[in-house]
């Protein structure tokens, strides 16, 4: 999406297929030597940083959890959000949607951004104030935006639609044949690890645990039961079942 945004590819494609030849209309910009601002430098953000550095872009990152050592390893400058906004020619978002990140690019932040900035959001809808983004696009302060996610999905009716300089896609982030195959394999491996070994990975309601950690956790949960058995008088008859709720949902 960043390439498409930089070179106005969707507009150029539509124009050419309409029988026009507007070569001079679609003047793009190069990525080389531009500054990319990452909001979020976790797994995906770090991969984007590596790709951008390969394009000879300068990369700055805002992420409260990014250590100076990790920033040095990634080859990025760790900065505060206001500095990122002032320096970035392109901004990409790579953060979950939380109370702290909702509307992180709002009206005030967009006003602080460098004039002519281009914004890409393939992370989560709600990170950008869409009404404020439309105003910034209409005024020309933001030169372009490419969105794969929206505050409400499916986004069948959005005030942003039709705004010049805007590229929209229907949340295609993981929509490749290879990604779907890899997800299926990963889920099968995770279920196998849990059922055969006890390891838990990528659950949404419990921390990831190794097989050994899972065994230790279960021993801890059963501790009161075992203690009660040792102190109780002998009892002849059916043993009451003790059930520990333990539901694992996989991403």
Predicted features by range, described:
Residues 1-35, 47-50, 199-202:
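Phosphate-binding beta-alpha-beta segment of Rossmann-like dinucleotide-binding domains, i.e.
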Residues 41-42:
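Glycine-rich Rossmann-fold phosphate-binding loop(s) that bind the pyrophosphate
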Residues 64-159, 175:
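Rossmann-like adenosine-cofactor binding region
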Residues 148, 171, 197:
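Active-site glycine-centered loops adjacent to acidic/histidine catalytic or metal-binding residues
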Residues 159-174:
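Short FAD-binding loop at a beta-strand-to-alpha-helix junction that anchors the flavin cofactor
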Residues 174-251:
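NAD(P)-dependent dehydrogenase/reductase Rossmann-like domain
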